[in-house]
């Protein structure tokens, strides 16, 4: 059975935030400290990112997206995505499949996201384009 996927409007965020925040924090744990859950909340509430949830009886997936208009191309970026149950890769695959039609309606020509290398198996249609290299400094 396919679960429901919904892109929430900003006035709906507070109704589901307590269920979504712990899921999103799982993704934040792998984001190298660039932002925290309060930053994510404000980016969504201020309209910079959209919050998507997948649910049946409860929320099983939460993710954020943003449409970015570059000078030559419009893309959908997925900054954060996580499932309540770490085994929910089927939900992740389903979310991408369901979002694709909406993305095209918005004029996006591509979808991009950062992921661990193992996700390549889940998304064989995506091309591995770059390797992110990072060096932390003592401050």
Model regions and ranges:
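Active-site rim helix/loop that mediates acceptor-substrate recognition in acyltransferases
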Residues: 30-51
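Short amphipathic alpha-helix that is part of the acyltransferase structural core
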Residues: 1-35
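Solvent-exposed, well-ordered amphipathic alpha-helical segments
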Residues: 1, 54-58, 84, 92-104, ...
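Terminal substrate-recognition subdomain of acyl/acetyltransferases
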Residues: 1-13, 114-139
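Conserved donor-binding loop and adjoining core beta-sheet/short helix segment
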Residues: 46-87
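Long, low-complexity, intrinsically disordered polar/charged segments
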Residues: 22-35, 54, 71-83, 100, ...
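Short hydrophobic/aromatic-rich motifs at helix boundaries and adjacent loops
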Residues: 9-12, 23, 69-72, 89-93
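Acyl-donor binding region in acyl/amide transferases
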Residues: 73-124
